[in-house]
């Protein structure tokens, strides 16, 4: 099961909501996954998740005392998945329920956008967001890129949902798609906040663990790359210094050098690959990095004079 499916499964099992929050969650599910059929009036809510279908069935009964029937169907193209259709037939109370959920007016005309009365409270905003995610949402595995999105049918609903996200501290962005719009979050902190707001605490824990692991892996990779680059610079500098010292020795002889320069020259000829700090630790008595660097620069200056004299001649 994917991370997105695990998250939905967890959210679908949240129970014990107060009436206002249950209404907000159910309204979002019906708004995004529902379809109103006329003559006689009938509401159809479709989902691929059995737990979501059970949630809708129970919420309709508890909130409005509406009778519903759940039908299981095979999807025509993807045979591996079932499709669950919650059918609410024409009955007393259906019209007022549709109006209360913001699906239509009293005269059963389709109502666009989000009904503001549903999300006046902070708790109801979170519940509506949870319902919208259960209906048409998805979240990427945190082992990849950070991305959470909710697909809606029109720009008005997308703008309303983005505005709802802003009220709970989320920066939902809009993007048009071939068959509608998406409201999405890209930042890792924003995705984590959304999971927390919706109540997906187990998914949030998995998300944060994966984020920590990925951040640590990236940090280690950066350090390794940095160490590799530094090692390359150290080796290149050591080889250059070795060549200069051999030039000086060939021209003047090692014994003609002063004891301090002779000591460092011998160490560098013996250990061309080590860093200045390590070279200083090999000396007896040990030398500081700056001291080793100063002596090697002296030797390189002598070598440069030799090369310059050759050029003039």
Curated annotation (Swiss-Prot):
It comes from the Bacteria. GO terms for biological process: cell division; regulation of sporulation. GO terms for molecular function: DNA binding. Keywords: Cell cycle, Cell division, DNA-binding. The keyword DNA-binding applies. Residues 275-308 bind DNA. SUPFAM superfamilies: Homing endonucleases (SSF55608). InterPro entries: Homing_endonucl (IPR027434), Sporu_reg_WhiA_N_dom (IPR018478), Sporulation_regulator_WhiA (IPR003802), Sporulation_regulator_WhiA_C (IPR023054), WhiA_LAGLIDADG_dom (IPR039518). NCBIfam families: DNA_bind_WhiA. Belongs to the WhiA family. Involved in cell division and chromosome segregation. HAMAP family: HTH_type_WhiA (MF_01420). This is Probable cell division protein WhiA. It comes from Desulforudis audaxviator (strain MP104C).
């Amino acid at each position: 099961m994917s991370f997105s499916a695990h998250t939905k499964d967890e959210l679908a099992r949240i129970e014990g909501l107060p009436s206002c929050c249950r209404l907000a969650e159910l309204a979002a599910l019906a708004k995004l996954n529902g379809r109103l059929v006329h003559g006689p009036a009938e509401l159809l809510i479709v989902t691929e998740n059995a737990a979501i279908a059970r949630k809708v069935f129970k919420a309709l009964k508890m909130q409005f005392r509406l009778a519903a029937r759940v039908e299981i169907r095979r999807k025509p193209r993807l045979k591996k998945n079932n499709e669950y259709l919650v059918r609410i037939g024409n009955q007393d109370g259906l019209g007022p329920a549709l109006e209360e959920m913001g699906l239509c007016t009293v005269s059963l005309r389709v109502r666009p956008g989000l009904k503001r009365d549903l999300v006046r409270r902070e708790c109801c905003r979170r519940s509506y967001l949870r319902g919208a995610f259960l209906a048409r949402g998805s979240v990427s595995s945190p082992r990849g890129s950070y991305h959470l999105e909710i697909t809606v049918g029109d720009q008005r609903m997308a703008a309303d949902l983005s505005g709802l996200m802003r009220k709970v501290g989320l920066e939902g962005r809009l993007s048009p798609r071939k068959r509608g719009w998406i409201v999405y979050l890209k930042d890792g902190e924003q995705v984590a906040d959304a999971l927390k707001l919706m109540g997906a605490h187990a998914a949030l824990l998995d998300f944060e663990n994966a984020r920590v692991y990925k951040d640590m892996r990236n940090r280690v990779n950066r350090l390794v790359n940095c160490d590799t680059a530094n090692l390359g610079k150290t080796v290149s500098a050591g080889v250059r210094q070795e060549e200069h010292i051999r030039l000086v020795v060939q021209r003047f002889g090692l014994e003609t050098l002063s004891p301090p320069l002779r000591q460092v020259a011998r160490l560098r000829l013996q250990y061309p690959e080590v860093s200045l700090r390590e070279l200083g630790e090999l000396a007896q008595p040990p030398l500081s990095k700056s001291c080793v660097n100063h002596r090697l620069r002296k030797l390189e200056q002598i070598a440069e004079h030799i090369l310059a004299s050759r050029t003039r001649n």
